[in-house]
Regions:
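Hydrophobic faces of well-ordered beta-strands that scaffold small-molecule active sites
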Residues: 3-7, 37-39, 68-71, 98-102, ...
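Acidic, glycine-rich active-site loops and adjacent beta-strand->loop/helix elements
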Residues: 9-10, 42-45, 72-81, 104-108
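Alpha-helix N-cap and loop-to-helix initiation/capping positions
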Residues: 14-21, 47-51, 78, 82, ...
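Conserved N-terminal glycine/acidic-rich loop preference
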Residues: 25-26, 37-39, 77-81, 96
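Conserved residues at beta->alpha junctions
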Residues: 50, 74, 171
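Internal, glycine-rich beta/alpha segment that forms the wall or movable "lid"
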Residues: 79-186
């Protein structure tokens, strides 16, 4: 059996930012034998924090065993090439101790804040995840999607973990759960991420 801790820091008016406390909690979780800590990404809100890669890097530098994971990287809000670079770099810094949780997002306020259209989230997510996987596993590639286009390029570094860190997909709706199951069945059960 494995034990994980999900951190959803909340900052109420007048409270200091929780970064020191987050690091203390992660270090304590490692001392207690927890296997993984999950960091939450939220924007324009008093809960979760926006800069998960920075928090993850700090956590990796202050621990030696516990896995550091995301719950989740909201892919429509990020450039997928940057996500691939950031998490491959963190995978090297942690010597394979990262998992990458991804999601499409569901909070209208966050989409409005980034000037994005919520009903485009699924397609933006799908394109971004495809780009990230290809960036991690192909020597070079180009992309011509609805939302992302770029000429042939090589994305570096490639991950420390081969072929890439474990990828976890968040799902709230029945539709998303069925879609994830369908992807796994289409892959004849060989998908390990």
């Amino acid at each position: 059996m494995k034990f994980s801790l999900i951190l959803v820091p909340q900052v109420l008016e007048g409270m200091p930012e929780p970064y020191e406390h987050i690091t203390e909690q992660i270090c304590f979780a490692e001392e207690l034998g927890f296997d993984t800590v999950w960091l939450t990404e939220h924007h324009f809100s008093p809960y979760g924090r926006p800069s998960v890669p920075a928090i993850a890097g700090h956590a990796l530098a202050n621990t030696s065993r516990i896995r550091i994971s995301t719950a989740v990287v909201v892919l429509p809000f990020q450039h997928p090439l940057r996500v691939a670079e950031d998490w491959a770099t963190l995978d090297h810094l942690g010597r394979g101790r990262v998992d990458v949780g991804v999601g499409r997002g569901n909070q209208p306020k966050e989409f409005a804040g980034f000037n994005l259209i919520l009903h485009e989230a699924e397609q933006r997510f799908s394109e971004a995840l495809d780009i990230i996987r290809r960036a991690w596993t192909e020597e070079s590639f180009s992309y011509d999607g609805e939302f992302w286009q770029f000429p042939e390029l090589s994305v570096l570094p490639k991950p420390y973990t081969k072929p890439h860190p474990p990828i976890w997909q968040a799902a709230i709706s029945d539709y998303t759960v069925k879609k994830i199951i369908g992807l796994a069945q289409d892959d004849k059960g060989s998908r390990k991420d």
